């Protein structure tokens, strides 16, 4: 057999273009401060599991009930992922096959709703997600969505409005959870409202799952009928999703909805990486990590407010804060770009009752999980906040074209900080 290098040639030789792009991305992650709240940095072990030979294996079905042969070892992997997820969140049932956060939510809708049914979800402008009923998303196109939001005076969830809307519209399902809400969710009150109108309570805890696992946010599982979460973000695993419940009937419906309802063969290499991340989150030091994430987010929010940047709801109880830039007279879009040039990565984000268009916005969303994984503590996050204020003030004074000197100065200081907290040595 002629040796074509198929089993031996490394990526740098076989595809230098892709190898080069990956190396550049590694350099970006090493040299920039990552503040996107939905991003994190996985362990070397998670990377290794996701890049394993499990990518070769098709495994339609569930452990012990596959439609393909040769699944005895991937069954071990998936069973470990399931058992670790159940232990981590104290639940009876876990489906670890959803490929993404959108698909995990779609699976619940497929299991519990019919097209045209009514459900309630947090409005995108108040910190919800596209899959919580946005009109441009499948969830908003296939179902009758009644959105709820926050109060204008304090940007906190308006539980009176939520109860009133639930009694008025009688939804079949109420969805709690969001992507840009920085305060503690009252799961018990949501369940009370759901029970009053005979609705399912679904919680999407994608953003705060790591904080729940680490004991820094109340778990929704004692109250929710079904819980979804991504496995990355604050949970620090690979990109993917899962569905949790304590109800055997719902678990059966969810399993059927994920496969064969929504997906075919699961991504076994990703499920292996999920299992590794769950194992890491079960270690005692993960509780320390979760506590540090919250402490860092609070320090950053506090320092931003000292610098004259408004923080939605006046602070944070979790891993993120939402900065309202209107007092500074700059937009989220311009600020995201300016901070990017200074090697601070974040995302533009709408604020409650935002007058700007979705691709412009009046705010930026800032998260602590990735920086905390890197080793940053409160002092580093306060310094990061001061750099953000410096860039924003420069942007307000000099405009987008005249802020290069400020951005270059901050960039040099950012790179010096990053050099003290290296990523993936030897990779």
Curated annotation (Swiss-Prot):
GO terms for biological process: glycine biosynthetic process from serine; tetrahydrofolate interconversion. GO terms for molecular function: glycine hydroxymethyltransferase activity; pyridoxal phosphate binding. The keyword Amino-acid biosynthesis applies. Its main location: cytoplasm. Pathway: One-carbon metabolism; tetrahydrofolate interconversion; Amino-acid biosynthesis; glycine biosynthesis; glycine from L-serine: step 1/1. Its cofactor is pyridoxal 5'-phosphate. The keyword Ubl conjugation does not apply. One of its GO terms (cellular component) is cytosol. (6S)-5,6,7,8-tetrahydrofolate binds at residues 124, 128-130. It catalyses: (6R)-5,10-methylene-5,6,7,8-tetrahydrofolate + glycine + H2O = (6S)-5,6,7,8-tetrahydrofolate + L-serine. The record marks 232 as: Plays an important role in substrate specificity. Its EC number is 2.1.2.1. The modification N6-(pyridoxal phosphate)lysine is found at residue 233. Keywords: Amino-acid biosynthesis, Cytoplasm, One-carbon metabolism, Pyridoxal phosphate, Transferase. It is found in: Cytoplasm. Gene3D superfamilies: Aspartate Aminotransferase, domain 1, Type I PLP-dependent aspartate aminotransferase-like (Major domain). Catalyzes the reversible interconversion of serine and glycine with tetrahydrofolate (THF) serving as the one-carbon carrier. This reaction serves as the major source of one-carbon groups required for the biosynthesis of purines, thymidylate, methionine, and other important biomolecules. Also exhibits THF-independent aldolase activity toward beta-hydroxyamino acids, producing glycine and aldehydes, via a retro-aldol mechanism. Homodimer. Belongs to the SHMT family. This is Serine hydroxymethyltransferase. The lineage of its organism: Bacteria, Pseudomonadati, Pseudomonadota, Alphaproteobacteria, Rhodobacterales.
